[in-house]
Design a protein with these regions (language model features):
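Glycine-rich, flexible loop segments associated with nucleotide phosphate handling
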Residues: 24-31, 67-70, 101-115
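Conserved beta-strand segments of alpha/beta enzyme cores
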Residues: 40, 73-75, 137
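Alpha-helix capping/helix-boundary segments
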Residues: 11, 47, 83, 113, ...
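Active-site neighborhoods of divalent-metal-dependent phosphate/nucleic-acid chemistry enzymes
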Residues: 75-123
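Acidic, PIN/NYN-like endoribonuclease modules and their adjacent C-terminal/linker elements
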Residues: 2-4, 33, 114-148
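Short catalytic/ligand-binding loop motif for oxyanion handling, primarily in non-cytosolic enzymes
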Residues: 14-15, 49-53, 132-135
Length: 148
């Protein structure tokens, strides 16, 4: 059982959101249960970028503070040259196979996240299984269950 979980932007955004909506609380409690079960939860730099840019745009200072807290509390995975080179390979592979995951001129965060997950031999917790599962093990975050 893979116990390394990389958070995609969607669950990371829910966990860092200070609004105690039922969905946000469910996601936060899910993360806590995985941690208590011995999972390593990783905040990938590319997911931090996706969440952070929107929080900055919207002036959500409480969300930024929570995101910073998560970044400093959980394991943070910075981007590296090796990861970016692998992401470029994945991007080209997807295009050549007719399965692009983003516009040709867009920064494709999914392939960058997939490259980070491959480097860590981890599973991606997401709400966007389709694109990510082309490259790496990805599951809806609700389907990654703690082990006893």
């Amino acid at each position: 059982m893979n116990k390394i979980v990389l958070l995609d932007a969607s669950p990371l955004g829910m966990i860092s959101n200070p609004s105690a909506t039922p969905a946000n609380l469910e996601c936060y409690n899910w993360m806590e249960s995985l941690l208590m079960s011995g999972y390593q939860i990783i905040v990938p730099e590319i997911a931090d970028y996706e969440v952070r840019r929107e929080l900055l745009r919207a002036g959500k200072t409480r969300g930024l503070a929570r995101l910073d807290l998560l970044k400093n509390t959980l394991d943070y995975l910075p981007l590296t040259t090796a990861v970016m080179l692998k992401a470029a390979e994945l991007w080209a592979q997807a295009r050549n196979q007719g399965t692009p995951t983003a516009d040709a001129k867009a920064l494709d965060c999914d392939v960058i996240l997939a490259a980070q997950a491959l480097a860590e031999n981890g599973i991606v917790a997401t709400e966007n299984v389709g694109h990510l599962s082309l490259f790496v093990e990805a599951k809806d975050w609700r389907d990654i269950l703690p082990v006893s």
